[in-house]
A protein has these predicted regions:
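A residue-level signal for conserved active-site and pocket-lining positions in enzyme catalytic cores
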Residues: 6, 77, 194, 228
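Short, surface-exposed amphipathic charged segments that create phosphate/polyanion-binding patches used
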Residues: 103-104, 185-189, 229-243
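Phosphate-handling DNA/RNA-contact segment within nucleic-acid enzymes
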Residues: 96-191
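N-terminal single-stranded DNA-binding subdomain of primase/primase-helicase replication proteins
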Residues: 1-22, 95-100, 110
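A generic structural motif
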Residues: 218-227
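TOPRIM metal-binding catalytic domain and adjacent DNA-binding surface shared by DnaG-type primases
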Residues: 23-105, 109-112, 146-147, 182, ...
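Acidic beta-strand-to-loop metal/phosphate-binding motif
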Residues: 154, 190-203
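Short, aromatic/basic amphipathic alpha-helical patches
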Residues: 203-215
Length: 258
């Protein structure tokens, strides 16, 4: 930050450029500072556009091992119903050192197979379960695997999506990204299943209202205080298949009572 505040005259500003002008600094110095700030911003923007997997990333498939970390990470996935097929399909790996040490890495790729996000989940019981990259979440999770001609399923996290399997899109949070909303309309998606917890469903009510008005069949799937990963593939889909399309009266009830 370039904010400044003079405690004598109480003047303040948001950039060194305004401060230097105020004190009548040499023009050469002012020009140098003025050029520095845009370059700095541009550099940060360019850096933020490219995301890479952690350099310490180890693939379960291409870099198998017999270390304690490998066994712990693999067991963690297995206990959550993630088998070798999903591990290979989604390119899941883990880190034993670095910023994401002792964490499972679940990548997300866009339609062109370019990394657009990844989730880092502790497999050793850390107080901080997730430690994600400092980039925007305005992406379409698992986009590479989405078939827009079929109903899509919106869920909160990657483990939920791995449990649901079929056309599941993790939101990496409780709100629906703008990029995803736009894509839903451009692809003319006809049916959407929303598999989120109570808090997340409240955040999505306005969107559901808009989707319903635009003729998109919407389903609020209620898992009774469970998450997809707890229930597993078969039970989740039993609930999804038994869920009726959300009607206007259902929508009003959700709005009034949650």
């Amino acid at each position: 930050s370039q904010k400044w505040h003079c405690w004598v005259c109480d003047k303040k500003g948001r950039s060194l450029y305004t401060l230097l002008k105020l004190i009548r600094a040499p023009k050469a110095l002012i020009d140098e500072v003025r050029e520095y700030k845009p370059n700095y911003k541009r550099k940060k923007i360019e850096e933020s556009q490219t995301l890479y997997l952690p350099k310490e990333f180890k693939s379960f498939i291409f870099d198998p091992g017999n270390s304690v970390y490998y066994q712990q990470a693999y067991t963690f996935l297995k206990d959550r119903g993630v088998d070798a097929t999903e591990i290979a399909r989604y390119g899941i790996g883990y880190c034993t050192e670095g910023t994401y040490a002792e964490r499972i890495i679940i990548p997300s790729y866009d339609k062109d197979g370019i990394l657009n996000y990844f989730t880092a989940r502790s497999f050793t019981g850390s107080n901080y379960k997730y430690k994600n990259p400092p980039v925007s979440k305005d992406v379409i999770g698992f986009e590479f695997f989405v078939n827009w001609n079929e109903p899509i399923v919106l869920c909160e996290g990657p483990f939920d999506a791995l449990s649901i399997k079929r056309n599941a899109i993790p939101l990496f949070g409780k709100t629906i990204p703008t990029t995803l909303i736009k894509r839903i309309y451009t692809e003319r998606v006809k049916e959407i299943y929303i598999v989120l917890d109570e808090d997340a469903r409240q955040d999505s009510i306005k969107l559901v209202d808009k989707l319903m008005k635009d003729g998109i069949k919407t389903y609020f799937v209620q898992l009774q205080d469970k998450d997809p990963n707890e229930l597993g593939f078969n039970k989740v889909w039993d609930v999804i298949h038994s869920t009726n399309q959300t009607s206007f009266s259902d929508f009003i009830k959700h709005r009034l009572y949650g």
